[in-house]
C-alpha cells in the first residue's frame, strides 16, 4: 500500500459520507461531552493570553506542560461553510453532470491531483487488498470502511510516520484543524500544519500523508475532516488517538 492509496480511499469514503449525510454525525461526535471530558486534563486557574475574538479558550496542565484547548461551534454543518477552512481563498470544485461521475477516473484525478493512471493503479492495489469492492446495487467502487478504520487506528503511524519540520504558514491539521470543533495545541502556539502558501496559521510543518493533500482538502470539506483526524491519530498519544478514532468512526457511518 502507498500513501496515495490511503488518500484515494478516504476520498471515496467521503463521497459515501456525502451520499449518506454523515457529516452531522461526525460533528455531533466531535462536540459531545464525552469527547470533551476525554480531552480535558485538570483545569488550572490561569487566564490564557491570545486567542481569537469570539473563541472560547481554556488552559490546562498535563504532565507539567500547558495545553490550550479551543472550542469552536459550527451551527450549520451542511449549509454554512464559513469557518471550516484552514486557508484564505476558496478553491472551486470541478462541475459534475451526475453523482456517479464523482467516482470516475477523471473526477478523482481532478479532485486529488493524481493522474488517471495513478488513480487506476491505486484502485487496483486497493481491490487486491480487499479495501475496495463494487457496490452490489450501483456497481460503483465501494470502500471497506471498517477495515480502513482499523488500518488507520493501528498501522498508519508506523507505515507512514509523521515527519515534522520548521515553522511555516500552512493549513492546520490534527486537532488544530478548524474543521473540528476543538483543538489542542501547546501554550506556545505550536500547532501542526500542512505547509501551504494560502494557509491561515503558522505552526510546525507536518508532511502530509501525500503531497497533494493540501490541494485536495480545499475541494472537499469531509475529506479535510478525515485527514485531519488521521493526522491526530498519527501525532497523538493513546487518549488523543482514541478520541480521533471515535469521531472518525461516526463520520464514516460505523458502529
What role is predicted for each listed range?
Residues 80-91, 104, 134-166:
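Short, cationic-aromatic polyanion-contact patches
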Residues 12-18, 87-100:
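Short, amphipathic alpha-helical "recognition" segments used to contact nucleic acids or chromatin
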Residues 1-12, 54, 84-91:
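Short, leucine-enriched amphipathic alpha-helices that occur as contiguous helical runs
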Residues 114, 124-139:
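A short, conserved structural fragment
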Residues 22-29, 34-35, 49, 104-112:
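Short alpha-helical "recognition helix" segments of helix-turn-helix
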Residues 143-188, 204-206:
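Short, amphipathic alpha-helical interaction segments positioned at domain boundaries
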Residues 179-255:
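Mid-protein regulatory/catalytic core that forms ligand/cofactor-binding pockets
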Amino acid at each position: 500500500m502507498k500513501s496515495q492509496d490511503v488518500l484515494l480511499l478516504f476520498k471515496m469514503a467521503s463521497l459515501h459520507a456525502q451520499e449518506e449525510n454523515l457529516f452531522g454525525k461526525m460533528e455531533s461526535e466531535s462536540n459531545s461531552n464525552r469527547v470533551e471530558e476525554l480531552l480535558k486534563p485538570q483545569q488550572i486557574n490561569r487566564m490564557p493570553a491570545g486567542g481569537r475574538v469570539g473563541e472560547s479558550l481554556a488552559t490546562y496542565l498535563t504532565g507539567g506542560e500547558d495545553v490550550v484547548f479551543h472550542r469552536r461551534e459550527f451551527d450549520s454543518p451542511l449549509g454554512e461553510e464559513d469557518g471550516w477552512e484552514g486557508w484564505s481563498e476558496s478553491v472551486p470544485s470541478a462541475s459534475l453532470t451526475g453523482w456517479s461521475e464523482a467516482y470516475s477516473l477523471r473526477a478523482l484525478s481532478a479532485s486529488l491531483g493524481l493522474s488517471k493512471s495513478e488513480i487506476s493503479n491505486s484502485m487496483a492495489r486497493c481491490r487486491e487488498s480487499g479495501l475496495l469492492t463494487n457496490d452490489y446495487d450501483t456497481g460503483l467502487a465501494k470502500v471497506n470502511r471498517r477495515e480502513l478504520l482499523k488500518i488507520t487506528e493501528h498501522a498508519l503511524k508506523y507505515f507512514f510516520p509523521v515527519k515534522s519540520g520548521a515553522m511555516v504558514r500552512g493549513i492546520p491539521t490534527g486537532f488544530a484543524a478548524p474543521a473540528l470543533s476543538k483543538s489542542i495545541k501547546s501554550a506556545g502556539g505550536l500547532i501542526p500544519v500542512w505547509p501551504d502558501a494560502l494557509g491561515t496559521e503558522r505552526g510546525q510543518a507536518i508532511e502530509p500523508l501525500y503531497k497533494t493533500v493540501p490541494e485536495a482538502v480545499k475541494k472537499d470539506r469531509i475529506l479535510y475532516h478525515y485527514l485531519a483526524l488521521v493526522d491526530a491519530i498519527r501525532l497523538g498519544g493513546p487518549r488523543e488517538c482514541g478520541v480521533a478514532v471515535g469521531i472518525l468512526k461516526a463520520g464514516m457511518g460505523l458502529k
